[in-house]
Regions:
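Loop-to-transmembrane-helix entry motif
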Residues: 69-77, 113, 117-120, 207, ...
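Alpha-helical transmembrane segments and their membrane-interface exit regions
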Residues: 51-61, 76-79
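Membrane-helix interfacial "entry" motifs
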Residues: 14, 37, 60-68, 96, ...
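Transmembrane helix-loop junctions in multipass membrane proteins, especially transporters and channels
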Residues: 41, 45, 60-64, 88-96, ...
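Alpha-helical transmembrane segments and their helix-start/interface "positive-inside/aromatic belt" motifs
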Residues: 25, 64-74, 248
Length: 267
């Protein structure tokens, strides 16, 4: 399951989505997330599905690789669906003892499941097609107006970049520790929830130690190179909007207009 997490990983490919400016992809991801919450009917989610499918095809990232990330939220998805079905009041369609499944609960469960899945896939496409350095530069440029309010934009962007960069590293470290623990007789799969939580303790302690050690090594390396942020720092590859970025913004605005129209019309 650890290997199935795709957020934070980068998949190299020669695609239109990979070539887009990181600012375009950041704004596009935010716009897609907003649209997921604007749509509230299955007709609306059909439009979101078409848009998302188009992005996946244009990204040239294997569908299997993208959907692999859904395995990590499968249990959360089941819990969300279950509690929405039995806790939402409305017309009862099925009953077993004190457990009642309502029609409204089924609709809400389906809606929440779709939203959760689309949020994960949408975020995964952005990180799979954008390197951490590109994300840092794009985020810093987008937040640059906040410099006038004395907000440390560069530091915020750098922290997010380091966090994204550490995700695959920590996942790899976790996988190594799990294999070492399993070789010593540890069992992470069997048992109830409490037993599984207890079995995770030998995994978490060395993982935290490794994370702090890596963070300390990175901090010392940055200090040794006299690293400092600021407005005077230059970029090896300055960000510039191109024609494909303008086309992407037009498509995004049209898509959001459809989402707002669906919401206003109650479709």
């Amino acid at each position: 399951m650890i290997r199935d997490i795709t957020i934070g990983q980068y998949y190299p490919a020669d695609s239109v989505i990979h070539k887009l400016d990181p600012r375009t992809k950041l704004v596009g991801t935010i716009g897609f997330i907003v649209s997921v919450f604007l749509f509230h009917t299955f007709a609306g989610y059909a439009v979101a599905t078409i848009f998302l499918a188009g992005m996946i095809l244009l990204s040239k990232v294997p569908v299997k690789f993208i959907f692999k990330g859904l395995k990590t939220i499968f249990r959360l998805l089941l819990i969300t669906i279950f509690f929405n079905m039995i806790l939402t009041p409305g017309e009862v369609v099925w009953k077993l003892g004190f457990i009642k499944v309502t029609k409204e609960g089924l609709v809400l469960a389906g809606t929440m499941a779709i939203r959760l899945v689309y949020l994960v896939i949408g975020s995964s496409i952005m990180t799979l097609t954008t390197t951490p350095n590109q994300l840092t530069d794009g985020l810093e440029r987008l937040l640059r107006p906040l410099n006038k309010l004395h907000v440390p934009v560069h530091d915020i962007a750098m922290m997010m970049s380091i966090a994204l960069r550490f995700i695959p590293i920590l996942l790899e470290e976790t996988d190594k520790i799990m294999k070492a623990q399993i070789a010593r007789g540890a069992d992470f799969e069997n048992g109830n929830l409490i037993q599984k939580a207890k079995n995770m303790v030998p995994l978490l302690v060395p993982l935290f130690i490794s994370a702090f050690r890596r963070a300390n090594d990175l901090a010392m390396a940055m200090e040794a190179r006299c690293y400092h942020g600021g407005d005077n720092r230059t970029q090896m590859k300055p960000l510039t909007y191109k024609k494909r970025d303008h086309v992407a913004y037009v498509v995004l605005v049209a898509y959001l207009a459809v989402a707002i129209g669906f919401r206003a019309a109650g479709i």
